[in-house]
Amino acid sequence: MNTVFQKDKIGIGKRKRAVARVFLVPGTGTITINKVSGEKYLQYNTNYLNAIKAPLEKLNLTNQFDIVAIVRGGGLTGQTDSIKLGVARLLCKMEHENRLVLKPFGFLSRDARIKERKKYGLRKARKASQYSKR
């Protein structure tokens, strides 16, 4: 797969600690994540696969594009949602009318929730040792 991608044809999505760079290539609807087939990478979880394909399905473009993603960081849930956001952003970049379709479904919303840092003196971010009054 020695395809050269143009810089303006890239969609970037983030969720939790995961960052995805997404490319849409004219094709048959296959998903490739980190040079591995999407089914294998996502452990054959249909929920993850359907989530990635959802923006394309809303626009009836499922079998017209192959999704190629490079993802770093996070777990499978964060990576899946970051790819989904990247696909939606790239579809809007390709054609502005797609934004009007995808926006009501929440595909263009970045989920800003990230892990809270651990504070000193506590066991976790908020968990403290049991308080004894006497």
Swiss-Prot record:
<dbReference type="GO" id="GO:0003723">
    <property type="term" value="F:RNA binding"/>
</dbReference>
<dbReference type="InterPro" id="IPR000754">
    <property type="entry name" value="Ribosomal_uS9"/>
</dbReference>
<keyword id="KW-0687">Ribonucleoprotein</keyword>
<dbReference type="InterPro" id="IPR023035">
    <property type="entry name" value="Ribosomal_uS9_bac/plastid"/>
</dbReference>
<dbReference type="InterPro" id="IPR020568">
    <property type="entry name" value="Ribosomal_Su5_D2-typ_SF"/>
</dbReference>
<dbReference type="InterPro" id="IPR020574">
    <property type="entry name" value="Ribosomal_uS9_CS"/>
</dbReference>
<dbReference type="Pfam" id="PF00380">
    <property type="entry name" value="Ribosomal_S9"/>
</dbReference>
<keyword id="KW-0689">Ribosomal protein</keyword>
<keyword id="KW-0150">Chloroplast</keyword>
<comment type="similarity">
    <text>Belongs to the universal ribosomal protein uS9 family.</text>
</comment>
<dbReference type="GO" id="GO:0006412">
    <property type="term" value="P:translation"/>
</dbReference>
<keyword id="KW-0934">Plastid</keyword>
<dbReference type="GO" id="GO:0009507">
    <property type="term" value="C:chloroplast"/>
</dbReference>
<dbReference type="InterPro" id="IPR014721">
    <property type="entry name" value="Ribsml_uS5_D2-typ_fold_subgr"/>
</dbReference>
<dbReference type="GO" id="GO:0003735">
    <property type="term" value="F:structural constituent of ribosome"/>
</dbReference>
<protein>
    <recommendedName>
        <fullName>Small ribosomal subunit protein uS9c</fullName>
    </recommendedName>
</protein>
<dbReference type="GO" id="GO:0015935">
    <property type="term" value="C:small ribosomal subunit"/>
</dbReference>
